[in-house]
């Protein structure tokens, strides 16, 4: 074979006709790789530049959270620094329902730790699965809440909160009020001073892990402002005493309700205010709306004979009367005026103005009222605060009612002289007596220590002094308020027994029994009013039912405040005049006596 015709064997790694095809394939591969690279670069550009903020927000939404920084509500103290309302740290458990449902096999353990039914808990989570925050249980004890968190269930978290606690419970309930589960004031001084006490929660930005636990605090968004403390005018010792004596009186008389208020006459500070029935603010679930009402502030009553010192203030100011003159004829204990029988419980014959106070004569008071200028009488009642709010700042305070003087009909004017035809609150009444006690200076009642600087002279010091001496006779022998006496102290006061209004007139057997007084009479320090509503057992007279409560509370308060005894051992000359020229022998006084209303058809 010729070597020219010989063909060398093909190279084992070379294929025929591969040149152009290989290049085409190479181009395709390179093109695809280039497209992939461009896509990756574009995606990276989209992630890092175009949609960077969107994805960052999405990531933050999963792991970056703004959490509240809870603040403690301010503590409420009594005037001596004793705590009346404090905030205790608690823990609330909340959940992200969707995350918890992903571990639904652990729901029974969660339910057991929370103290709830497992099926109910699962249903609750399912119903709210579209939310990211749902409370499972509020205000748990920290140890119990930590036991829930220790289960390590995804989506279960804790939030620190505070719960209000009232050490004195029902004793101070009506004054303090209470807060709701979010620690905001709902009634009483908790509501009145809510902004002061609540403070403002702060906020911080944190990073949470997938279990919801905080792994890092990033920054404080808003600084917390804790609530400020509040010091009240209330003296816890006197408050306990007032509450205890009021409770004993209601149990003894089987009355429907009762109220007592004690004021410092020099400042207008409320030292004690108690009502029954009451409630426990630490266990609101068992209370009724009627139990939560501060009756001394929100309820009104016809004051009955406790208004007579105010009538006498107008009489003395008019210049027509002095404590001993003129002589008033009570016309045998009955005065038939415009077809109505205004009557006393006894025939007192001839009385001085002081005697009208001593014996609580309705006939005498009505006669005095009808001799006074209507404008003067109305202005005096109004100046003493009747028909006006005391502006104490207490939520829901009633203003009472007093018709404008020019609209008074003669009969209306007569019965206004002994406390019918107007409505007052217990606070208004005790403030009126405190005004007499402080030389005719009226202070705005205050629940805050230090009192209110607002004051005004409404009657002259001379008239106020005369009224005090006239009112001292009420606790003297043969008068209506002997049971309100206090050993070694002089007492100026006034009893009041009023029929309660009912449909069509006045109820024959339902009474409001009251005593209002000032101690010591020679140098007044305290004024107090006790009102017992509808006593059903024993006597219903104000001097008999409410007088002893006043006596025991004031005796204890004077001792607690270190007020020295005055024990003046004298009585202002007043009461029924003796002598053949004026009146025969007076009937014996078998029991404390008081007023009665006109006939029940009185308008």
Model-derived features: positions:
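Beta-lactam-recognizing serine transpeptidase/beta-lactamase-like catalytic domain environment
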Residues: 4-7, 85, 208-221, 260, ...
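Periplasmic/cell-envelope proteins involved in peptidoglycan metabolism and beta-lactam response
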Residues: 1-284, 375-385, 506, 533, ...
């Amino acid at each position: 074979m010729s070597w020219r015709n010989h063909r060398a064997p093909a190279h084992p790694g070379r294929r025929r006709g591969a040149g152009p095809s290989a290049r085409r394939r190479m181009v395709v591969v390179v093109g695809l790789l280039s497209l992939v690279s461009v896509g990756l670069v574009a995606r990276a550009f989209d992630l890092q530049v175009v949609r960077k903020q969107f994805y960052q927000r999405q990531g933050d939404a999963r792991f970056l959270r703004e959490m509240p920084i809870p603040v403690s509500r301010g503590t409420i103290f009594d005037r001596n620094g004793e705590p009346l309302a404090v905030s205790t740290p608690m823990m609330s458990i909340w959940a992200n329902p969707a995350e918890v449902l992903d571990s639904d096999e652990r729901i029974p353990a969660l339910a057991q730790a929370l103290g709830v039914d497992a099926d109910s808990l699962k249903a609750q989570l399912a119903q709210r699965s579209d939310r990211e925050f749902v409370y499972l249980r509020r205000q748990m004890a920290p140890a119990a809440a930590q036991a829930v968190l220790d289960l390590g269930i995804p989506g279960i978290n804790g939030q620190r909160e505070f719960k209000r606690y009232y050490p004195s419970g029902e004793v101070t309930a009506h004054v303090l009020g209470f807060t709701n589960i979010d620690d905001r004031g709902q009634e009483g001084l908790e509501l009145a001073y809510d902004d002061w006490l609540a403070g403002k929660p702060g906020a911080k930005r944190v990073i949470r892990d997938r279990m919801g636990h905080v792994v890092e605090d990033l920054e404080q968004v808003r600084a917390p402002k804790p609530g400020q403390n509040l010091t009240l005018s209330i003296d816890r010792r006197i408050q306990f005493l007032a509450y205890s004596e009021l409770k004993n009186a209601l149990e003894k008389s089987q009355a429907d309700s009762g109220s007592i208020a004690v004021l410092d006459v020099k400042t207008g500070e409320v030292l004690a205010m108690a009502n029954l029935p009451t409630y426990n603010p630490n266990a609101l679930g068992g209370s009724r709306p009627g139990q939560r009402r501060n009756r001394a502030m929100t309820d009104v009553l016809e004051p009955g004979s406790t208004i007579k010192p105010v009538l006498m203030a107008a009489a003395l100011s008019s210049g027509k009367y002095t404590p001993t003159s003129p002589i008033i004829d009570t016309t045998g204990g009955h005065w038939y005026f415009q077809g109505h029988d205004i009557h006393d419980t006894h025939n007192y014959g001839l009385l001085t103005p002081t005697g009208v106070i001593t014996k609580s004569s309705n006939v005498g008071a009505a006669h005095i009222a009808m001799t006074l200028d209507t404008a003067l009488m109305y202005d005096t009642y109004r100046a003493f605060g009747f028909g006006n709010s005391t502006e104490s700042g207490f939520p829901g305070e009633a203003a009472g009612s007093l018709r404008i003087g020019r609209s008074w009909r003669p009969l209306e004017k007569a019965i206004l002289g002994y406390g019918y035809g107007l409505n007052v609150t217990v606070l208004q009444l005790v403030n009126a007596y405190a005004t007499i006690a402080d030389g005719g200076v009226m202070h705005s009642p205050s629940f805050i220590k230090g009192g209110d600087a607002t004051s005004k002279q409404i009657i002259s010091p001379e008239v106020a002094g005369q009224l005090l001496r006239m009112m001292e006779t009420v606790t003297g022998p043969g008068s209506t308020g002997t049971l309100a006496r206090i050993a070694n102290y002089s007492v100026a006061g006034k009893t009041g027994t009023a029929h309660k209004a009912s449909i069509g007139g006045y109820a024959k057997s339902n009474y409001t029994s009251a005593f209002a007084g000032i101690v010591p009479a020679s140098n007044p320090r305290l004024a107090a009013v006790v009102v017992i509503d509808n006593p059903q057992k024993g006597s219903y007279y104000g001097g008999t039912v409410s007088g002893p409560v006043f006596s025991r509370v004031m005796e204890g308060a004077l001792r607690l405040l270190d007020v020295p005894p005055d024990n003046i051992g004298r009585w202002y000359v007043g009461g029924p005049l003796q002598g053949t020229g004026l009146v025969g022998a007076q009937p014996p006084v078998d029991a404390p006596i008081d007023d009665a209303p006109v006939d029940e058809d009185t308008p």
